[in-house]
Amino acid sequence: MEIRPTTDEDLDVFVDTVHAAFGRFPETPVEGGGLWWSALEMDRCLLALTADGRPVGTAAAHSFELTLPGETLTPAAGVTAVGVLPSHRRQGVLSAMMRHQLAELRSRGEFLSVLLASEAPIYGRFGYGPATYTARLTVPRHEAAFAVPRARGVADTPATGSDNGSVEVLRRAECGKILEEVYDRYRRAQPGALSRPHRWWALRAGQPPISPAPRYVAVHRDADGVPDGYASYSIGEPETLTVDETIATDDAVFTALARFVLGHDLVTKVVFKHLPPEHPLRWQLADFRAGQVSDDTDWLWVRLLDVPRALTARGWFTDGELVLDIDDPFLGEHGRYLLTVRDSKADCVPTDRDPDLSLDISDLGSVYLGGTAPSTLVRAGHIRAHRPGAATLADALFRADRSPHCLHWF
């Protein structure tokens, strides 16, 4: 079997192969773009071929920026389009492609790789761990009354129904530039968020609101008329308003947009897709049970390729030190590192000291952004704590300034 990078001439073969791997047929091109594969970077795609040259597997990567805790932006490879023909499953094709791809990412100097897992059991064995989570919240419109905030000093805010800004409803085709600018402001401050390169917006490659699918967009503007949030939505049967994504530069803007869509006439319920599981919207409702959570699941998976570089890249919010014993069975690597945090900066160096925690590289990916507490994985039997208090200290160290969240599909 040969694994080789692709060129522009391989696009049709690559697309046909990945669709065949998933048992689907390629979509018909539509006016205005919108085909997901139009954003592929062909110099970052791989084809697996049999000895006689038949393509049987695919893998690709996008060039993204990932926001880390502390509002640090760093390059990250967004792995996608991974598939193997059903006729060649269980023959080592996927493992060979993953090993080839990880080596290629390292040769590019990249130390983080991320993906969305089609099936959860697949990617842990390649060193990826679930790092952000998402949920769907459904609110019956007749139960959508907001509670009166109990905290002092919150008068005249969207939480109380007061908003100095304004909301304008536009069609998706009218506001692409606004969406791109607002999303970019949002993702730079949100740990776990990925960039959406300009070419994605220009090609309309992705899911709504990037794609040209018909959508209405509620655009929020501040008191000076500057756009600072949006909600992309559509109304379908049975009388349901579905919000693809709500992007807001702060909680007040989100609340204003939530009030707007929950007040829409001629619908019986509003469905918010891709909310963080701990989002405060349920707490803002007068009836806590009115907001029904479903599809609570993983979203972004993270894989570290260089432990010291990755740990020193993110921001930290508690001083302390830990010795981490890290096993990377897929790449056949093992390392022990002393992580020292002082004044929000980390130093990470090899050490022969006794470990505080022993963990798999996939578990380090899960805790890296602060969305999974190390103590949770200790209790689950995945991380081993070698001394009392080690898990508690790890929780404090890896905590993020803001819960990580990603809603970008790729």
Language-model features, listed with the residues they occupy:
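Intrinsically disordered, low-complexity, positively biased terminal segments
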Residues: 2, 7, 11, 69, ...
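Hydrophobic, small-residue-rich alpha-helical packing segments that form membrane-like cores
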Residues: 3-12, 18-20, 33, 47, ...
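Conserved beta-strand in the GNAT
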Residues: 47, 54-63, 78, 83, ...
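Conserved acetyl-CoA binding element of GNAT-fold acetyltransferases
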Residues: 73-86, 239-249
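Conserved acetyl-CoA-binding loop-helix of GNAT-fold acetyltransferases
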Residues: 79-106, 250-262
